[in-house]
Amino acid sequence: MDKTQPHPLFKLATELGPLIVFFFVNAKFNLFAATGAFMVAIIAALIASYVVTRHIPLMALVTAVVVIVFGTLTLVLHDETFIKVKPTIIYGLFAAVLGGGLVFNRSFIAIMFDQMFNLTPAGWRILTFRWALFFAGMAVLNEIIWRTQSTDFWVGFKAFGVLPLTMIFAIAQMPLIKRYHQDPASLEASDAAEGDVSKG
């Protein structure tokens, strides 16, 4: 089934909306109420994404599953540790998948950026390595913040710090993308010579 490309504002709303809900419910009530609201908002965002685009991004689906699992543990056991460690699990998982893919000469970042860029195999490898390092760094940063700062500070960082950091990192990759960008005809020749790392 063909995927409909969503409007950038819609994509931003489905990604940032649940975090904003999480932040404001935590400010108004507490972390446990915010966790429940976050779970509902995540599910609503997935449904909206599928209704509009007939497609659910892999990263969004993985994130939602982890949120629901750790959110449920948080509420059932009434222990905020689970929801706080959730980002560490997600970032660590992404870093492991991307890094592990490189070991087997597969660039899974090419799947994440499907149809957005046409890069040479070398370009995909470098970009994948950088994103693996970024996710690993974010996992470490989340651990440091939730273990050393207040819950409100952690919630604020999660809601309003993670996205800017991700955007800054993504923008910083543009020189690499421009350097290794190729038109489709040249890319086919390059893939034949080096092997398409996105497909193994």
Swiss-Prot record:
Subcellular location: Cell inner membrane
Annotated disulfide bonds: none
Bilayer-spanning residue ranges: 7-27, 32-52, 56-76, 93-113, 126-146, 153-173
GO annotations of cellular component type: plasma membrane
Membrane topology summary: Multi-pass membrane protein
Stored Pfam families: IspA
InterPro entries membership: YciB
Keyword vocabulary terms for this entry: Cell inner membrane, Cell membrane, Membrane, Transmembrane, Transmembrane helix
UniProt record similarity statement: Belongs to the YciB family.
Alphabetized NCBIfam families for the sequence: ispZ, PRK00259.1-1
Free-text function comment from the UniProt entry: Plays a role in cell envelope biogenesis, maintenance of cell envelope integrity and membrane homeostasis.
Protein name: Inner membrane-spanning protein YciB
Species for this entry: Bradyrhizobium sp. (strain ORS 278)
UniProt gene name: yciB
